[in-house]
């Protein structure tokens, strides 16, 4: 049976935390900041944790993530 492939798009977007959860950067945080409030920009700086409902689906894309 051939080796499973890691989904490269998911590998670039998700990192594993020390406790085993997956974190990712929020959307809308790369440009066009003049149109965003200070509060919105502050919240965009903090990474988000993958919800339990999505965890299994995303973990299947990252087959070799330890």
From Swiss-Prot:
It comes from the Bacteria. Keywords: Ribonucleoprotein, Ribosomal protein. GO terms for cellular component: cytosolic large ribosomal subunit. The keyword Ribonucleoprotein applies. GO terms for molecular function: structural constituent of ribosome. InterPro entries: Ribosomal_bL35, Ribosomal_bL35-like, Ribosomal_bL35_CS, Ribosomal_bL35_sf. One of its GO terms (biological process) is translation. The keyword Ribosomal protein applies. Belongs to the bacterial ribosomal protein bL35 family. NCBIfam families: rpmI_bact. This is Large ribosomal subunit protein bL35. It comes from Lysinibacillus sphaericus (strain C3-41).
């Amino acid at each position: 049976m051939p080796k499973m492939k890691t989904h490269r798009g998911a590998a670039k977007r998700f990192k594993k935390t020390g406790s085993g959860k997956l974190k990712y950067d929020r959307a809308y945080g790369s440009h066009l900041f003049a149109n965003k409030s200070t509060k919105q920009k502050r919240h965009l700086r903090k990474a988000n944790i993958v919800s339990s409902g999505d965890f299994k689906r995303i973990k299947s894309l990252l087959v070799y993530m330890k």
